[in-house]
Curated annotation (Swiss-Prot):
InterPro entries for the chain: Mo/tungstate-bd_C_term_dom, ModE, ModE-bd_N, Molybdate_resp_trans_reg, Mop_domain, Transp-assoc_OB_typ1, Tscrpt_reg_HTH_LysR, WH-like_DNA-bd_sf
Identification of the protein by name: Molybdenum-pterin-binding protein MopB
Intrachain disulfide bonds: none
Recorded superkingdom: Bacteria
Residue ranges of coiled coil: none
One term of GO molecular function: molybdenum ion binding
Domain spans labelled Mop: 131-197, 203-269
Pfam families named in the record: HTH_1, TOBE
Organism the protein comes from: Rhodobacter capsulatus (Rhodopseudomonas capsulata)
Annotated TM spans: none
Recorded family membership: Belongs to the ModE family.
Transport found in the keyword field: yes
Keywords: Molybdenum, Repeat, Transport
């Protein structure tokens, strides 16, 4: 777990906020405050109000943390407009405690260095921070790499007995030094995720078939965002047409399969 100082203030110094990073998961003050509020209230909606977030932003934050950390920090189920019940796990409690201790230590350390630095630490850290528009991001462990002169097939554990395969260039695999046991981030845009109804044909060119249960569906006039629970605190989100969501009768509780082409899986190092 690494710690960085977050965002600079108007005086050019680092603001007193720490971002914890573990396997690519960014845990800033806002998300840690959200975790603490969930622990106090037992509700995502109540916690969101307490820290000044929308319910959607809070729920997305919980999903992101659970997907990117080794163990879920919150066990929760969305409850529509009324919000849902939520329980802070032991892993979540440890993260809050670690954040408090590291924040105090980093604040003391950086305050002693800022006066002698010739550049703004906040500016440097902002430049080094990874940001991605991919809706789905998971921390995975590589268990197999098969490469030829052009391409490499990388197989990873997604959790709960489910695997994910990515096909990348052989050069990228070599530069990333991917091997069994490597930890990577797997990124997939939500519009690259297809959802299938019952009876998925065996003969499909789509390599990845991830089983899950619908836990949330948000409808817009033309599109729908559907989130599946994959087990183990992991989720996957797909953006499909609203007509497709209605045709497949995708509502909370329905079991379905997410289909992802291996070429649509992007890998990054944590």
């Amino acid at each position: 777990m690494a710690a960085t100082k977050q965002g600079g203030g108007d005086d050019g110094r680092c603001a007193r906020g720490v971002v914890l990073e573990r396997t690519g998961a960014r845990m800033g003050a806002e998300r840690v405050a959200l975790l603490a509020a969930i622990g106090r209230t037992g509700s995502i909606s109540a916690a969101a109000r307490e820290v000044g977030l929308s319910y959607k932003a809070a729920w997305d934050g919980v999903q992101a943390m659970n997907n990117l950390l080794a163990a879920p920090v919150v066990t929760a189920a969305p409850g529509g407009k009324a919000g849902g019940g939520a329980v802070l796990t032991p892993a979540g409690e440890k993260l809050i405690a670690a954040y408090g201790a590291i924040e105090a230590g980093v604040a003391k350390l950086l305050s002693s260095f800022e006066k002698s630095l010739n550049l703004d630490p906040a500016e440097v850290l902002r430049g080094l921070s990874l940001r991605t528009s991919a809706r789905n991001a998971w921390a995975c462990k590589v268990w197999s790499v098969a490469a030829d002169d052009v391409a490499a097939q990388v197989r990873m554990r997604l959790g709960e007995g489910q695997d994910l395969t990515a096909v990348i260039t052989a050069r990228s695999a070599a530069e990333m030094r991917l091997a069994p046991g490597s930890e990577v981030l797997a990124l997939v845009k939500s519009n690259f995720v297809l959802l299938a109804g019952a009876g998925v044909p065996e003969r499909l060119s789509v390599r990845n078939r991830v089983r899950g249960r619908v836990i949330e569906r948000i409808d817009a006039p033309l599109s729908s965002e559907v989130t599946l629970d994959l087990g183990g605190g992991k989720t996957i989100t797909a953006t499909i047409t609203r007509d497709s969501a209605e045709m497949l009768d995708l509502h909370p509780g329905v079991e379905t399969t997410a289909l992802i082409k291996s070429s649509h899986v992007i890998l990054a190092l944590p």
